[in-house]
């Protein structure tokens, strides 16, 4: 079993930052590192499709190619912004497939993440079918999780904590382990 973790964006990606200037990739990568550690402890091989240093924003086509070469699962980790003029909030999970099980997987990941972190989304449907490139083009099961809103005064102090990052990582790990049974 190989899981590809995709920590979205890179340090130089313009506009991808928190209200306090913290770059999105920093938050994404911290969660990705926790996921890698937790899955590795369970004997699952983890590869990353992003640049571990964050110095470059790896093109989406390269991320997908890396996943398609080896992965049995693809999880893209992001943090959200810009919804409702800073009034968006909570976790959102995106999926894209003609297979009905993909929506069930997305809902399972969302429920696990909210169950562990308590950061419930304020959207009417926080599990969304969306044709993002990394979801459309990967051959294995693929989900994209937005781990709270960087421009939300409610979410920001929560998403910057190690406790939250570890909680999201635990949710991803538990989801993968449960789904492969």
Locations of regions flagged by a protein language model:
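Generic detector of leucine side chains in alpha-helical contexts
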Residues: 11, 19, 27, 38-39, ...
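Catalytic-core regions of hydrolytic enzymes
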Residues: 2-101
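Active-site-adjacent substrate-binding region
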Residues: 100-128
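A broadly tuned preference for mixed-charge, low-complexity surface segments
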Residues: 19-20, 46-48, 52-57, 123-141
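Extracytoplasmic/secreted envelope proteins and their assembly/folding machinery
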Residues: 32, 36, 64, 103-110, ...
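Hydrophobic alpha-helical segments
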Residues: 20, 86, 106, 160-162
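Active-site-adjacent mobile loop/cap segments within catalytic or ligand-binding domains
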Residues: 3-6, 15, 69-70, 74-76, ...
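Sec-exported extracytoplasmic/periplasmic mature domains
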Residues: 36-44, 68-72, 110-118, 173, ...
């Amino acid at each position: 079993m190989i899981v590809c973790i995709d920590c979205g964006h890179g340090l130089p990606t313009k506009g991808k930052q928190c209200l306090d200037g913290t770059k999105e990739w920093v938050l994404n990568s911290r969660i990705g590192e926790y996921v890698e550690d937790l899955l590795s402890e369970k004997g699952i091989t983890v590869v990353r499709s992003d640049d571990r240093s964050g110095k470059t924003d790896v093109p989406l086509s390269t991320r997908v190619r890396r996943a398609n070469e080896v992965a049995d699962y693809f999880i893209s980790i992001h943090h959200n912004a810009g919804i409702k003029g800073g009034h968006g909030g909570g976790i959102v999970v995106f999926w894209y497939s003609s297979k009905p099980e993909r929506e069930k997987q997305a809902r399972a990941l969302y429920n696990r993440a909210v169950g562990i972190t308590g950061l419930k989304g304020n959207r009417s449907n926080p599990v969304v079918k969306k044709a993002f490139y990394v979801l459309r083009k990967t051959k294995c099961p693929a989900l994209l999780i937005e781990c709270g809103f960087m421009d939300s005064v409610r979410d920001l102090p929560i998403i910057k904590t190690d406790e939250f990052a570890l909680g999201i990582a635990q949710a991803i790990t538990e989801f993968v382990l449960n789904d492969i049974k």
